[in-house]
Amino acid sequence: MLKDYGTLFAGEPEQSAAEALARRVKHIAEFVAQSAVQPAMAPAAESQHRVTYHSSCHLRAAGVTKEPRAILKKLPGVEYVEMPDADRCAGGAGTYLVKDFDTSQRIVARKREAVESSGATLVATSCPACMIQLKTGLPPDVEVKHIAQVLQESYEAARRRAGETAS
């Protein structure tokens, strides 16, 4: 992740520029959570979603853990529930799900138990590899979406509702 960029150039002439870049890089969850301007949001579905968050290993290592949850807790139409072991790996780990498929399936089975015990109907995450692993490892009635997708749906729902009331 670009937050680690400075470490790639340790001892090199580019180190200070890389560190400066790394300080400016923000994950979308950090940007939205820290932004003074919050766009209008509305429930993206007619019924309330029970949502949990899977912390990806990469984002957790970058120290981004509170912001995604804070965003989800603020979304209209969302009941946020913390699943057990939310910070435990889902078994995707980039290419790990291909390199050691059997172990990755045992790992995602534990994640499935955690999601099911939370009662969530939607799992949000910030990692494409985790999304693939969760989509294949969770029951089909549990949706898996990137947190940016969840935000986009809420923003679009607010825009649609604003258009309906303007008519």
Cite the ranges covered by each PLM segment.
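Iron-sulfur cluster-binding electron-transfer modules in prokaryotic oxidoreductases
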Residues: 1-167
